[in-house]
Amino acid sequence: MFDLAATPLFGVDPGLLSFSLDMSMPPMDAAAAMDTVMEVGFIRHLIPASCWKAMRRLNIGSERKLRTAHTVLRRFAVEMIEERSKITLNGRRCALSYDDEHEDILSSYINDPDYTDNDLLHAVLLSFMLVGRDTIGTTLPWVFYNLAQNPGIVSIIRSQLSPIASRKVPASMGAMMIFEPEDTKPLVYLRAALYETLRLYPSAPIERKTVAAVDIMPSGHEVKAGDTILISLHSMGRMEDLWGKDCLDYNPNSWLSKDGNTQRYVPSHKFLAFNSGSRICPGKEIAVMQMKTIVATVLWNFDVEVVEGQIIQPKPSCILQMKNGFIVKLRKREL
């Protein structure tokens, strides 16, 4: 997911999942640093501000880890910018660039006079990286975990993929069937399965807002300027008042019309996985598209079995990752 997010952003492939000739893998420093940022950010919500600010001044504990992580991420951003510059020759892209027809996000910012400040540019790029990597990379394990517990739902998804697969020609005998974004676009049930996962396991489980001025909430609570409001999206997705008595069940049909052919309207302020209103995630449809193509390709080509004995639980972090990872067995399907 790190490479998937970085390639369209920087116009170059970091190659974190590539192997060298000695079969060793490149260091995952930047990816690990992002995990640290999210974990320390969560810790800041659990302890008094005076405590973490003191640790920051003394450069100890979690704040020391955060400072190191920021250094790693800044170095990564600088390296990617330099690498992007190398593959641009006389204003033209060379063969190593991301796409001959589409400009990568980094290039658009470099050409924007409002982003001449390197610190601002680094901050914006890393924000894109965090959002692009974590939304997809965090959600997919939960998607496959839920689907593995519900084989009937997997059967429905495969039945909807079947007519699409019958029209596609595999690259070679025995090759995997790869689904493209256009193939999965009409699959509303698959989208519903993703949304149902995000309801129960939102990639960002908490939403933090700072009050700008004195106001009274619709609930009647008075808030003052400077107050911090924490919204638990994880809890909201499991509230009976919002989602009904079966709120803890994994049921994609709850997102569909009675005939199952269209997606039912659900207000964004009720389903905040992609935020709401003017702050709704601009990359929402891109993230959904990428997840649909990945899930469709995996489910069509493989049976996914969860390895027994592992403890499935979330990590204490601003991102709802699986604490112990997710181990599965993939068995090639006989098609």
Q: What spans do the regions from the language model cover?
A:
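Conserved cytochrome P450 K-helix/beta-meander segment immediately N-terminal to the heme-binding cysteine loop
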Residues: I231-N261
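Short, small-residue alpha-helix embedded
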Residues: T135-A148, I294
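Residue-level recognition of short, solvent-exposed, well-ordered loop/turn junctions
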Residues: P218, K224-A225
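Cytochrome P450 heme-binding "Cys pocket" and the immediately downstream C-terminal segment
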Residues: P151-I153, I229, K284-Q321
